[in-house]
Amino acid sequence: LDDDRLATFVEGLRVITIAPELRGAPELIRRLADLGVRVSLGHSAATLPESRAGYDAGAVTTTHLFNAMSGVVHREPGLALAALLDDTVWVELIADTLHVDPELWPLIWNLKPVERVLLVSDAIALAGSGASRGMLGELEVRLDGEMVTLVEGGNLAGSVSALDLELRNVVRAGIPLAHAVRAASRNPAELLGLTDRGRLAPGLRADLVVLDADSFAVRRVMRAGEWIVTA
């Protein structure tokens, strides 16, 4: 694509995931970064050098760390290790206890600066629907308890978790509350360039979520200064 067509294609797009080992990926990452798109590395079998080349080209974040990527293998380290060792890039964590073992969560916060960890739900359309089966794109998925899997093959396929549950999970796993809250609020806002939200300060948008002190259940929600959910 020429520059004009690429700019039209990504208009309004904030984040895109790219596997850095694919042919032409570093050049595409550079072009997308120049257009203001936040490039995330993921769904990848990249080696450590290929991963670092992707970050060097302008990728700034990492799609659901450890999931659907080359990992931390002592002889063949891949994308997960590259992301953990680079203090400048963000990493996403699906903290539903199914996608990444909770024993690994403290490792992430120990290796990464606190401002570079993001909590994500990876929730799909089944979340909150009450249905036990549905579609993920063109793939049929089913829900078994809290686990979503492909009907054909049985692989994990997204989540039905929510950020309030993930916040509770990481705090109960020993992550300091302030670090967990930041990973679910300020850090994502900063990654997306949303300078008017994500923290509490005079002049910023008043977005608040009030959680139960014990269960972390959502009690009240304020959006742009107006209460839209009250218990």
Give the location of each predicted region.
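His/Asp/Glu-enriched, well-ordered alpha-helical/loop segment
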Residues: G78-L93, T97, W109-L211
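Short glycine-rich loop/turn motifs that provide flexible caps or phosphate-binding loops at active sites
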Residues: L41, A57, A157, L192, ...
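Active-site core of metal-dependent hydrolases
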Residues: L1-A131, L150
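Short, structured coil/loop segments at alpha-helix boundaries
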Residues: A25, D86, D101, P176, ...
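C-terminal cap of metal-dependent C-N hydrolases
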Residues: L200-A231
